[in-house]
């Protein structure tokens, strides 16, 4: 109780809308944000864009086995769960505060039965080995520190070895023209397809009733196994 007060936990509501003819569909997600310096404790622009992609494709999520990596406050994972996916949330085993915030997000949205596990990128841990086959891996802004890029892709590749049809849906914020994962994709026999934001109604500065992503340059890509060893496409 005292710790939560010290952390100054706030709430932010995201409301996703979709009009199809005269029919309007709506979904609300409430996210707890801990107002401190740890960047995994509040919503970043990439998370809203990835959540918008999930919302746009919500009809394809029912009963899909979904793992969110580097979940932080879990906006995409929570939305996927509310759309009927079988979700597992994960963040670094070395960041228990983020894991607790994943649980807090579930509780705040009345979601039960969603496992929250510690996964450290690049490590083949017991929790990683115990995961069931995964259909979709989610990751928003996980390509944040270049030193982590290969560990992220190593973890993704390990999961895809067990489920070759799996896809890694990820958004990232363009911070430097010098940063690229292309060589690493080739190394780990992966390929990616860029998804234009306009194709899922994410090409504006304000999504889900928020002020995000703002003017940040966010890109969306889908990473899969490259069976031909061709590397990067799209």
UniProtKB/Swiss-Prot annotation:
Its main location: nucleus. One of its GO terms (molecular function) is histone H3R17 methyltransferase activity. One of its GO terms (cellular component) is nucleus. It holds the Pfam family Methyltransf_16. GO terms for biological process: epigenetic regulation of gene expression; methylation. Disulfide bonds: none annotated. Its EC number is 2.1.1.319. It catalyses: L-arginyl-[protein] + 2 S-adenosyl-L-methionine = N(omega),N(omega)-dimethyl-L-arginyl-[protein] + 2 S-adenosyl-L-homocysteine + 2 H(+). It is an enzyme of class 2 (transferase). It is found in: Nucleus; Cytoplasm. InterPro entries: Methyltransf_16, SAM-dependent_MTases_sf. Belongs to the methyltransferase superfamily. METTL23 family. This is Histone-arginine methyltransferase METTL23. It comes from Xenopus laevis (African clawed frog). The lineage of its organism: Eukaryota, Metazoa, Chordata, Craniata, Vertebrata. The gene is mettl23.
């Amino acid at each position: 109780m005292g710790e939560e007060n010290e952390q100054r936990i706030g709430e932010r509501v995201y409301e996703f809308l979709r009009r199809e003819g005269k029919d309007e569909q709506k979904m609300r997600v409430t996210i707890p944000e801990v107002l401190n310096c740890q960047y995994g404790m509040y919503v970043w622009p990439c998370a809203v864009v990835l959540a918008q992609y999930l919302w746009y494709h919500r009809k394809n999520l029912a009963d899909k086995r979904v793992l969110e990596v580097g979940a932080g406050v879990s906006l995409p994972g929570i939305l996927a769960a509310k759309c009927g996916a079988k979700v597992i949330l994960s963040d670094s085993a070395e960041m228990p505060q983020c894991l607790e915030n994943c649980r807090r997000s579930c509780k705040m949205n009345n979601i039960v039965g969603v496992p929250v596990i510690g996964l450290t990128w690049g490590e083949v841990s017991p929790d990683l080995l115990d995961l069931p086959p995964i259909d979709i891996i989610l990751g928003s802004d996980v390509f944040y520190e270049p030193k982590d890029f290969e560990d992220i892709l190593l973890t993704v590749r390990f999961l895809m070895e067990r489920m070759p049809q799996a896809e890694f849906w990820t958004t990232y914020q363009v911070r430097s023209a010098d940063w690229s994962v292309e060589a690493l994709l080739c190394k780990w026999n992966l390929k990616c397809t860029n998804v234009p934001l306009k194709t899922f109604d994410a090409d504006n500065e304000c999504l889900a009733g928020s002020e995000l992503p703002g003017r940040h340059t966010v890109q969306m890509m889908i990473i899969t196994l490259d069976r031909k060893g061709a590397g990067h496409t799209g």
